[in-house]
């Protein structure tokens, strides 16, 4: 059986406001990420859906997302569908460690910026190994909103996480507070 190379995708985006007060984005993504069309909210916020085209993560996949909001910019970043994390590649009784999937998100906000990071739910399949980190750096006058929904196993199919593991690290650094 042919073994496929893991994904090493990244997305780097910068948000800034124009003279009319609307937030625009620059930057781009490398597969398996794809940006869909950004919409402007009533308040000038850039509403941007992010698509993971591979359909899910398997052991060894490495994803990184870097978001940089310049002063006065506002953005809502969401995902198009649930993030699926499948069982680890190469995991067996002989190799119980398997390979971890990883996703790191770094958000850097400048003065008076506002970021809403609201991806759809994440489903960890049986025996998935997943490590995620979310790091946010923001000044006292900026705001950040996030929520996370995680399902451990596909419970409707009576599947459990079993020997899987989910590690999540959240770091928020507030300057001037």
Predicted region positions:
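Terminal catalytic/cofactor-binding subdomain
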Residues: 1-100, 161-177
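Solvent-exposed loop/turn tips at the surfaces of repeat/solenoid architectures
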Residues: 67, 112-113, 147-149
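Short acidic-hydrophobic catalytic motif
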Residues: 121-124, 129-131, 144, 148-177
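Repeated loop/turn-to-beta-strand initiation elements of outer-membrane beta-barrel proteins
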Residues: 114-115, 142-144
